[in-house]
Regions:
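Phosphate-handling catalytic cores of nucleic-acid transaction enzymes
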Residues: 1-193
Length: 193
């Protein structure tokens, strides 16, 4: 494996982890590059030519026997990503509670206006004021929170697409066990097409 082709900081990290866990260089380097790619892909594009650039996301498949320390290597390099996710979730706990209460109040107010429109309609009374209030209320709908979630193991294509679109716009399926990825919902016969 051309470990010398890696930038110094990545090469040194891969060599250090490789020496510590006694795993094959290619396995360690793949874990390092995969985690680095995941951390950077939302922020950086790779410029391959003057008018040719694209995402830094990678598709990596490393084949190794059981016991070659795939999980250990991945854990070393994804630990910072996992820690970041946990810290962000913890830091946003109060904000999440505030959002939930604001959203519940907004939903209750919306439900009340819809009920008022329905009742007024049944009694053949004007619904214009309620409709206008409902229209104005729609503009004050609380924005859903975006809490970083970068790592996925077993998820459906629909859930992954939803999470990338609505919760956090970057993520990766990183697993040291191919069966989890290839046997997951995302690789089902209907999804893989």
């Amino acid at each position: 494996y051309p470990i010398d082709a890696l930038p110094d900081v990545i090469r040194r990290a891969a060599e250090e982890v490789g020496a510590f866990v006694k795993a094959p260089t290619v396995l360690v380097a793949s874990s390092a590059l995969g985690s680095l790619s995941l951390a950077c892909q939302a922020h950086v594009d790779a410029k391959r030519a003057e008018k040719l650039q694209g995402p830094t996301g990678l598709f990596l498949l490393t084949i190794a026997d059981s016991g070659e320390r795939k999980t250990t290597c991945d854990s070393f390099f994804t630990s910072a990503i996992r820690q970041y996710q946990e810290e962000q979730a913890e830091a946003m706990k109060i904000t999440v509670k505030e959002y939930e209460s604001e959203n519940a109040a907004w939903l209750a107010e919306r439900e009340g206006l819809l009920s008022a429109i329905k009742e007024a309609g049944k009694k053949s009374k004007s619904t214009e004021v309620f409709k206008e209030n409902l229209k104005q209320l729609e503009y004050s709908k609380p924005e859903p929170l975006r809490i970083p979630r970068l790592l996925y193991v077993d998820t459906t294509p629909e859930a992954l697409a939803y999470n990338l679109a609505k919760q956090w716009p970057s993520g990766g399926m990183i697993s040291s066990e191919a069966g989890i990825v290839f046997g997951s919902h995302a690789m089902g016969k209907d999804s893989i097409m």
